[in-house]
């Protein structure tokens, strides 16, 4: 699962902070919304044509702000807590697969008091491991011995969630309340 909180303010302000390090000014935080979802290194390279080294530095600057401030600049989507509760009551097992580093994902779940709904939380590694959404989903499946997964479904609000599910031969549900589109 991914797409539980609206991270727009936190992510875009952290991207803005990283860009400022390079003397780049963003005119409007909404211009930075494409950074929501894909790996940061890719986004800095793709959208600002950063070299690998510049993208690495930008990611470090991003995380510098995110760790203390940006992590809390997001909000739970309306009705999400009730939805999670209902899913658990119906017997579903929920696991989180996010592009955010695992350490940040766990802090966000704790902050919103929803960690108890998830039996497993996985994200990218601060060391660059589990780089793509497909890598993260594969890690979730392997760590939980889910080798035969006809009842496993990836729910997400970005194309990267759906692509990652397909890479792992999972069914997926794309939701439109977040930052995805058709």
Where are each of the predicted segments found?
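Acidic, Mg2+-coordinating phosphoryl-transfer loop and its flanking beta/alpha structural elements
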Residues: 153-182
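Conserved Lys-Pro-Asp/Glu-containing loop-to-beta segment of HAD-superfamily phosphomonoesterases
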Residues: 133-162
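Helix-loop "lid/cap" segments that line or gate small-molecule binding pockets
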Residues: 18-19, 39-52, 108, 140-142
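A short, structured active-site edge motif that brings together acidic residues
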Residues: 115-130
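Active-site neighborhood of HAD-like aspartate-dependent phosphohydrolases
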Residues: 1-34, 48
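Conserved H-loop
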Residues: 25, 115-119, 147
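Metal-dependent phosphoesterase signature
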Residues: 45-82, 90-92
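Substrate-recognition element of Asp-dependent hydrolases with the DxDx(T/V) motif
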Residues: 83-109
């Amino acid at each position: 699962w991914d797409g539980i909180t609206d991270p727009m303010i936190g992510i875009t302000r952290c991207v803005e902070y990283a860009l400022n390090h390079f003397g780049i000014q963003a005119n409007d935080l909404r211009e930075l919304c494409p950074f929501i979802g894909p790996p940061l290194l890719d986004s800095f390279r793709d959208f600002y044509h950063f070299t690998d080294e510049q993208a690495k530095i930008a990611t470090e600057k991003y995380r510098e702000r995110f760790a203390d401030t940006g992590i809390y600049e997001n909000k739970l989507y309306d009705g999400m807590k009730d939805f999670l509760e209902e899913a658990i009551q119906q017997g579903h097992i929920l696991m989180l697969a996010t592009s955010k580093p695992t350490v940040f994902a766990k802090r966000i779940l704790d902050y919103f008091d929803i960690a108890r709904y998830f039996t497993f939380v996985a994200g990218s590694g601060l060391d660059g491991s589990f780089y793509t959404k497909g890598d993260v989903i594969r890690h979730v499946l392997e760590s939980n011995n889910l080798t035969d997964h006809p009842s496993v479904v990836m729910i997400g609000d970005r194309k990267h969630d759906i692509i990652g599910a397909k890479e792992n031969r999972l069914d997926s549900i794309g939701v439109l309340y977040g930052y995805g589109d058709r």
